[in-house]
Design a protein with these regions (language model features):
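ATP-dependent adenylate-handling active sites, centered on carboxylate activation for C-N bond formation
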Residues: 1-200
Length: 200
């Protein structure tokens, strides 16, 4: 096995490579920025690779939403061209039937997790010339997030992580792909880079 320093360097290098591969596009590229670590990493690395400000997008139900605050801090730091989309309860309720039909489920957690992405992508499709979106999807499943907070051992953590990666296509990837593609946008997921996933 590699030592910790080597592992960290390899994860860094493979993520940077995965992002660089996904920046090649004939169409305009945008970035979903939630303010969380995963999307912030993707945006920061992409901003470093770009010779002009990248275009980032965040969504929230009020201007003082905590996610919008963190996304704005990241956007300011990386000097992106940042757009905040504020949605209302009526926006959510009027889109509920469409999102349920799109996802093919009544699962509350899945619908809740999808609504913001669906409405943000709808905004991007209707109001911008962006055709390709980079996201921070899949990092939670690869690195544990809340799923493994209480794993009794390193072996159990690894077992749960491997299970989540094997079943990835049934959950978040499908949800994100549907919310993005229904709005005529192409999703690109650097954390899903095969070389990166296999190493992690």
């Amino acid at each position: 096995y590699d030592d910790l320093d080597t592992i960290c360097k390899n994860i860094h290098d493979k993520l940077v490579s995965g992002i660089e591969k996904r920046l090649v596009a004939d169409a305009k590229v945008g970035y979903l920025l939630s303010g969380g670590l995963d999307s912030s990493l993707v945006c920061a690395i992409a901003a470093r690779q770009s010779d002009k400000p990248i275009r980032t997008f965040a969504i929230g139900m009020s201007e003082d939403a905590i996610d919008l605050k963190y996304a704005k801090q990241v956007a300011d730091y990386i000097k992106s061209e940042h757009t905040e989309v504020i949605i209302t309860k009526d926006d959510v309720l009027s889109s509920l039937d469409s999102v349920i039909e799109l996802l093919g489920t009544f699962d509350i957690t899945t619908i809740r997790a999808s609504m913001g992405m669906y409405l943000l992508c709808k905004y991007i499709h209707e109001k911008t010339d962006i055709k390709v979106l980079l996201t921070g999807e899949i990092s939670d499943e690869l690195f544990g997030y809340k799923y493994t907070d209480f794993a009794p051992s390193a072996e159990e953590f690894q077992k749960e992580s491997q299970k989540r990666v094997r079943e990835l296509h049934m959950y978040d990837v499908l949800r994100a792909d549907r919310c993005i593609s229904v709005n005529s946008l192409e999703a690109r997921v650097p954390f899903g880079d095969l070389d990166f996933v296999e190493y992690v």
